[in-house]
Amino acid sequence: MATPLSISSNPLTSRHCYRLHLSSTSFKGNVSVLGANPSQILSLKLNQTLKTRNQQQFARPLVVVSQTAATSSAVVAPERFRLDNLGPQPGSRKKQKRKGRGISAGQGASCGFGMRGQKSRSGPGIMRGFEGGQTALYRRLPKLRGIAGGMRSGLPKYLPVNIKDIETAGFQEGDEVSLETLKQKGLINPSGRERKLPLKILGTGELSMKLTFKARAFSTQAKEKLEASGCTLTVLPGRKKWVKPSVAKNQARADEYFAKKRAAAAEAATSEPAASA
C-alpha cells in the first residue's frame, strides 16, 4: 500500500522569502510568492546576481566634481579613444543635398532655383551690385578720389618722450639723451615698424639738470624749457629720400639758380643805401 504524501497545512512556511534591491535604481521587488526549490538553484542565482551588482557598484571609477560643476545633474566618466568610438562631432558633417533626384528628395524639379526668371537660367546671372532696377548703391554715393592724407595717414612718425620721463630716468648732469640711451634706460622699447622711427622730445614736465639732447625733432614747448635750463640741443638730419639721378640733377641746378638769385637780391639791397648816401 502506497504511503500518502504529507502536505503542510501552511504552504507559506515552506517557502523562502527573498527581497530584491538594485543599487542603481529605487526599485524593490518581493519574490516571496516564488516556491521553494529543493535544488536551491534560484537562491544561488539570486545570490550571484546580488554579488555581481555589489561588485559593479564598488568597481565604478571615482569621479571628482568641482564646486562649479556640483550643480550638474549627471557626471560622465571620461572614456578612452578607441577605433570603435571615433567619429565626427554631431552636426559637423551635414548631409549633402541631392538636387535633381526627384521631388521626394526636396530639390528635384527646379533644384531650388525657382520656376522662371533670370536666376533660374544658365549663364553668369545678374551683375554685381544690381538692385532690381533702382539706382544702385555704388551710383548713389559720390566718387571720392584717393584717401585724405594718403595711405600712411594716422601712422606715427616719431617716438615721443616727455621731459618728465627723462627727469625720473636716472640721468646725471651732462649725460647725453639720445635714442640709444633711452633704450638702455628702458624708457622706450620700439618693436616692428617703430624701430625705424626717429626720436622726438615733448615738453610735458620740468627738467632740473643740464643734459645734451640729440633728437630728430623738438616740440616748441620742449625747446623753450630745455634752452631755459641750459641744455644743449642737436637736431639730427632726416633720412634722405631716394630720387632718380635725373631728378637729383635738376634739383641741384634749381638750388644753384635760386642761390644766385638770392645773392643778387642781397647785394642790390646793400648797394641802395650806399648810393642814396
Swiss-Prot record:
The keyword Chloroplast applies. GO terms for molecular function: mRNA binding; structural constituent of ribosome. Gene3D superfamilies: 3.100.10.10. Part of the 50S ribosomal subunit. GO terms for biological process: translation. The lineage of its organism: Eukaryota, Viridiplantae, Streptophyta, Embryophyta, Tracheophyta. This is Large ribosomal subunit protein uL15c. InterPro entries: Ribosomal_uL15, Ribosomal_uL15/eL18, Ribosomal_uL15/eL18_sf, Ribosomal_uL15_bac-type, Ribosomal_uL15_CS. Residues 103-115 have a biased composition (Gly residues). Keywords: Acetylation, Chloroplast, Plastid, Ribonucleoprotein, Ribosomal protein, Transit peptide. Residues 81-125 are annotated as: Disordered. Belongs to the universal ribosomal protein uL15 family. The modification N-acetylthreonine is found at residue 68. Transmembrane segments: none annotated. GO terms for cellular component: chloroplast; chloroplast envelope; chloroplast stroma; cytosol; plastid large ribosomal subunit. It comes from Arabidopsis thaliana (Mouse-ear cress). Its main location: plastid. The gene is RPL15. Residues 1-67 form a transit peptide. It is found in: Plastid, Chloroplast. PANTHER family: 50S RIBOSOMAL PROTEIN L15 (PTHR12934), LARGE RIBOSOMAL SUBUNIT PROTEIN UL15M (PTHR12934:SF11). Residues 92-101 have a biased composition (Basic residues).
